[in-house]
Amino acid sequence: MSDATVAKKPRETDDVPVPPTLRKSLKNRHIQLIALGGAIGTGLFYGSSESIQLAGPAILLAYLIGGLAIFLIVRALSEMAVEDPKAGAFSYYATQYWSKRAGFISGWNYWFNYVLVAMVELAVVGSFVNYWFPNIPKWVSAVVFLVAIAALNLMGVNKFGEFEFWFAIIKIVAVLAMIFGGLYVIIANVPTASGIRASFANWFTVDGGFLPHGLMSSNADGTWTGLLMALVVVMFSFGGTELIGITAGETENPRTTIPKATNGIIWRILVFYICALGVIMAVIPWSTIDGNSSPFVQIFDSVGVHAAAGILNFVCLTAVMSVYNSGLYANSRMLYSLAKQGNAPAYLGRLNKRGVPVGGVITSAIIIAIAVVVVFVWPDFAFNYLMSIATIAAAINWIMIMITEIKFRRVVAAGDGPNDLKGLKGQEALDKLAFKLPFAKVTPYVVIAFMLLVVVLMCFSASYRIAVVAGVIWLVVLFAAYQITQKRA
């Protein structure tokens, strides 16, 4: 082959330097496991006790309803991501198909949400380390993990993907081991600590049956329980599932990988939440699960694995590192996207030779470090108020994704869709969408109504009521911040 037939690749030494770009280094196995592990966190291993107490065995129905809602949210996001894969995902889409203000609010809201989530995860990492090394100060553990994960994210997206892959494997193995251990207790009729025979019939026969608190019921202390109240806890246990959309801009083949990962969400929820909690409540009477110890530990104890507490501690430490790793990745890409849209300082949009937005990684890590200091100095303030904003921020994100999906389809139908869709109009354009949202004419409105119902239900709980008020204030702050930045522009 002659030199004339070979296209010369531009190099940095040529007259026109090649600017660095985001690397499409995330493979199918990375995306599948990131999606798989994203829905499994400390909330499943420890927080499931709270949701079980709210609804009893009916919590399974709550997870099914909430799981369907989150599946449709990610399907909407993935419809856009497959056609127009970009870093920052829904912030970019909100800017492109809705308005620059919407992109600003969506992006900064998501970034701050993950800063707060990462803050709390790092604040508790010391508790897990102290299980084995009680003399190590908790702040030392937080600093070590903060620096280590930040360094990992600076190495390149492939390193992030590889670590998330193995973090997810550890969590998945732990859940599957619990499920099979519980099934062994049921099938082999192993004696339980409660004296009640392990059986799936316990869902319907123990302490009030399947729906012990009804849809909603008020308690003597003024608190509310029931299936509807459990939906609040359930929905926010799915936080982070939308990370699939963020990864689209760095995925090798988003048109095949993203749909596979998205369609698997419903099965992951069925296996890792509904099956896991169903087995737990078949072995342990739901009314005895009080949060003093993880129900996972109780299952392992039942099959003779008395080192379960130590094993679960390791799994939870892994889950915490995974959340911070994912959070730092998502935040750096969101800041990169905001900078490219003109909604953040320009330095956040620069990449190093590995295709990493260094400014976004370092800036996010520094802000998270400051937030961790706040947690240690004013723990009550941090957990009661800052995390309230994180809670409502997730609801804001999901509602904005669905509104953006409505706007996206209108733009596509008008002939201004991205890439191959440009120029096509009406139903012809919509039919060309590669990964369509099911029942797209009504689905976004149904999901938005459902999320608004969840926000209303939050008002019935004293702790979540703070979140609703904080969320309104937070939106006002974002609106004001956008107006200020536009006047300075």
Which stretches of residues belong to each language-model region?
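Membrane-helix boundary/coupling elements in multi-pass transport proteins
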Residues: K86, N109-V124, V233-T251, A309-A346, ...
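Membrane-interface "cap" regions at the ends of multi-pass membrane proteins
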Residues: M1-S48, Q53-A55, F71-R75, K86-A87, ...
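Helix-loop-helix connectors at the membrane interface of multi-pass transporters/channels
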Residues: A4, D15, Y92-T95, R101, ...
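TM-loop-TM module centered on a large, flexible mid-protein loop between adjacent transmembrane helices
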Residues: Y92-A94, S99, Y131, T205-N219, ...
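C-terminal membrane-solvent junction of multi-pass transporters and transport-like membrane proteins
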Residues: W166-F167, Y347-V358, W398-S463, R488
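Extracellular loop-to-transmembrane helix junctions
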Residues: L22-R23, Y46-S141, F145, I265-R268, ...
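Hydrophobic alpha-helical segments and their helix-loop junctions in multi-pass secondary transporters
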Residues: I172-H213, V279-I284, I401-D416, A462, ...
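A generic transmembrane alpha-helix motif of multi-pass inner-membrane proteins
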Residues: V185-I186, A382-N397, L437-A489
